[in-house]
Amino acid sequence: MPTIGIHASHEQLSPARLLEAVRNAEAAGFRAAMCSDHLAPWSERQGESGHAWTWLGGAMQATSLPFGVVTAPGQRSHPVVTAQAIATLGDLFPGRFWAALGSGEALNEHVTGDPWPTKRDRDARLLECVDVIRALLRGEEVTHDGLVRVDRAQVWSLPAEPPALYGAAVSEETAGTVGSWADGMITVYQPVDVLRRVIDAFRDAGGGRAPVAVQVHVSWAEDEETALQIAHDQWRTNVFGSELAWNLELPAQFDEAAARVRPDDVTEAVLVSADLGQHTKWLLELADLGVDAIYLHHVGKEQDPFIEAFAEHVLPELAS
């Protein structure tokens, strides 16, 4: 069975509350954690966005969990800076850290004032960043002149073994590209038949038996109405297609775009149910795809009731 972890949502909880949540999750039986490197939340209602890399040092010291981060080198974060951060966490916490590299969203990257590239150029930039980061993690001095520029850079403090570099992918096309270079893939929950094709595209393109992790957005409460209300309040800005999600620049723009999203529309992006047996069924179907890790993201701001309920009723079923 896959490792069951928790997704720590910087966009919704303050760094201190998020640290408390992952400590409670570990104590309850979750076996891993991940987060995303965001500068801004998806909605003004979410209202937070701590610095992921700073927080990771504290969270990994405070727990014994393995952690991963989804990040987008190339604009807001220069690949040399990203490589140094990866190396430092890899040295501090050997074997406990991975980083997933993606092409990013304007929501986080527009702040540099540089033009927002096309998806084609962002994908090309990402591949350049992967090459730069890998070379730096091997201890090489790097000079590069392309969509990113590097002048005689070196990362001086290196771990004995470099952390795994995953690729972030949602579509079959991107998964195929990721399979050609990544040590693993992180994707998001979709209908099982769609997700199977994404995973197959990754494996067929060279991913082979490399790890596949899936982030799953869930909403649980003791009654259906509350579970749906939580999902609609906190995650209705996350139901859009990739083109819109990539290109909006401000949380207020996401809120405006989501003004007509109905509660039932959110169930396309979030597994909503008050029935813990139903959540177990959904996750068992996902496990049957042969994924290596599932990271559960309860989209509400109150994490403890979710952690306690899933630890008692869902995690044991997934471990059997």
State each model region's role.
Residues M1-S320:
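Active-site-adjacent structural elements that line small-molecule/cofactor binding pockets in enzymes
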